[in-house]
């Protein structure tokens, strides 16, 4: 046998080992997440949301909404905030130099007026141009509603401006093109009150495509009409909800979605704020490098907070709840999905490079010896490795270098095993606990009431590895390529919006 044949055979064997390890880890995540899901669903019996609402230990919080060219969805998104059930909250909308009618529409629809407010620049940002405030007819629970207009500096810079303008000890980071469930804040704080060590908590993001939206809230959960969006529903459950739930259980989570997360403000300020080129904080420069920025600020800030916790040996952690607390719109065209996944991959590469000192470093515990290597191997190295495998293994079989048994083993581990993991993840999401007399009994992570919807998702879970995954791999590889050649920018995709314009709680209250 020639050296070429030996190399190809060895490479094929490495692929077999890779898929065996990857899908075995994913299945282990499902098992861990299933246990956590059951625990949290059962916990509702003893933790009614009314108790959280009335608890003196539930602190006020700031909701920070960075907005850039969100004219299509901004009214629906802000209207949903006015209906959130929480005892005391302030809403801070940061217009990041929008070039469309975002700011004008906010002012016109809600009645904001320009005025001066207390603003302390604890984190260095791009210049602020002005402040607007709504002082009359505030919705129930809203103690302050402010709009900050600033020069464009990116989402991370807008979040830092929101932190500077906030007056509460906790803040919520969210996207302007998303909808927060009306009970989301109470559900998240239910977990935080149970574990005082949590300094950050995130939640599952649901896809609003196919759902019925009224008055800024998802009233009925449905499945998308688009096959591309249906595959994403399965992917969100398997990779995001299940994977992050398991990593959080291990105290090794590396990302909280920028769509929704609750942070202790003092911790974020101590680590220097969200990463931008404007930051002057010592820890931000020490951890990530001076004058750097990122297209995935949500992952970078979590990794930096995790480093801070580990290095200071704090009894703190980053938490996660698998419940769908927030809803966002999934791209329904290949071009838009490609832009999104390209950016995600570039952001992953930036974060892995900035924080490369974590790799196999014992001072970071499970973060260093498991979570970080997992992302390096399976999210970075795995993308080109898998793609090459899908091309070369069938080709080597056709050329006679590999036997039919080897091809069968490859397909079993890469396609069949992967389908089993996806189906298991959907089943975990659909699992319903019916214990005690809780008003939320029988609830599940996936809020589908029609069994046919679940049947469709299970079918797409079986098909996910037959085309969709390979397309995603290609875009991830493009992201790696663009990262190495210095590509920057978000490349936002055009959104359809959430439906008809809602009535506004601020106007209703007035």
Positions of the model-derived regions?
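N-terminal membrane-anchoring/stem segments of glycan-assembly enzymes
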Residues: 1-57, 244, 421-428, 472-488, ...
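Hydrophobic helical membrane-anchoring modules
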Residues: 3-10, 38, 437-452, 456-460, ...
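Membrane-interface helix-boundary signature
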Residues: 4-15, 364-371, 375, 404-407, ...
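Non-transmembrane, amphipathic alpha-helical segments
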Residues: 12, 19, 255, 455-458, ...
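Membrane-embedded multi-pass helical conduit in multi-pass membrane proteins
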Residues: 33, 374-484
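Membrane-cytosol interface motif
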Residues: 42-65, 449-470
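Non-transmembrane catalytic domains and loops of membrane-associated enzymes and transporters
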Residues: 44-364, 377, 502-510
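Membrane-proximal soluble regions of multi-pass membrane proteins
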Residues: 336, 340-353, 457-504
């Amino acid at each position: 046998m020639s050296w070429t044949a030996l190399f190809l055979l060895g490479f094929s064997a490495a692929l077999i080992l890779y898929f065996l390890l990857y899908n075995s880890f994913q299945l282990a995540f499902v098992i861990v997440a299933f246990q956590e899901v059951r625990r949290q669903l059962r916990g509702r019996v003893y933790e009614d949301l009314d108790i959280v609402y009335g608890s003196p230990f539930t602190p006020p919080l700031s909701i920070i909404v960075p907005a850039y060219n969100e004219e299509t969805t901004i009214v629906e998104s802000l209207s949903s905030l006015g209906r959130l059930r929480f005892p005391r909250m302030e809403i801070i909308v940061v217009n990041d130099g929008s070039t469309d009618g975002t700011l004008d529409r906010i002012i016109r629809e809600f009645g904001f007026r320009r005025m001066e407010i207390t603003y302390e620049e604890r984190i260095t940002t791009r210049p602020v141009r002005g402040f607007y405030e709504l002082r009359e007819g505030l919705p129930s629970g809203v103690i302050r509603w402010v709009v900050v207009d600033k020069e464009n500096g990116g989402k991370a810079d807008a979040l830092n401006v929101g932190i500077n303008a906030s007056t509460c000890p906790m803040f919520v980071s969210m996207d302007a093109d998303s909808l927060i469930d009306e009970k989301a804040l109470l559900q998240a704080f239910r977990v935080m009150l149970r574990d005082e060590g949590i300094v950050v908590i995130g939640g599952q993001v649901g896809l609003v495509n196919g759902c019925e939206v009224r008055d800024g809230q998802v009233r009925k959960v449905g499945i998308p009409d688009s096959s591309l969006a249906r595959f994403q529903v399965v992917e969100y459950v398997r990779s995001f909800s299940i994977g992050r739930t398991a990593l959080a259980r291990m105290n090794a989570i590396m990302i909280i979605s920028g769509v929704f997360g609750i942070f202790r403000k003092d911790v974020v300020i101590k680590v220097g704020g969200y990463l931008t080129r404007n930051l002057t904080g010592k820890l931000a420069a020490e951890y990530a490098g001076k004058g750097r920025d990122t297209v995935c600020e949500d992952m970078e800030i979590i990794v930096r907070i995790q480093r801070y916790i580990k290095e200071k040996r704090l009894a703190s952690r980053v938490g996660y709840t698998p419940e769908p607390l927030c809803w966002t719109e999934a791209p329904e065209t290949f071009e838009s999905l490609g832009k999104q996944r390209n950016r995600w991959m570039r952001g992953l590469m930036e974060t892995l490079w900035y924080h490369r000192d974590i790799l196999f470093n014992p001072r970071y515990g499970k973060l260093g010896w498991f979570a970080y290597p997992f992302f390096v191997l399976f999210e970075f190295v795995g993308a080109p490795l898998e793609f090459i495998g899908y091309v070369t293994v069938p080709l080597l079989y056709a050329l006679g270098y590999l036997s039919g048994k080897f091809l069968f083993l490859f397909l079993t581990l890469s396609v069949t095993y992967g389908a089993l993991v996806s189906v298991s993840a959907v089943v975990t999401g659909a699992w319903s606990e019916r214990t005690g007399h809780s008003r939320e009994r029988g609830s599940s992570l996936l809020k589908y009431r029609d069994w046919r919807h679940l049947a469709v998702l299970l079918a797409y879970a079986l098909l996910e590895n037959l085309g969709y995954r390979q397309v995603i791999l290609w875009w991830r590889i493009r992201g790696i390529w663009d990262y190495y050649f210095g590509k920057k920018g978000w490349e936002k995709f055009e959104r359809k919006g959430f439906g008809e314009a809602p009535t506004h709680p601020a106007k209703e209250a007035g």
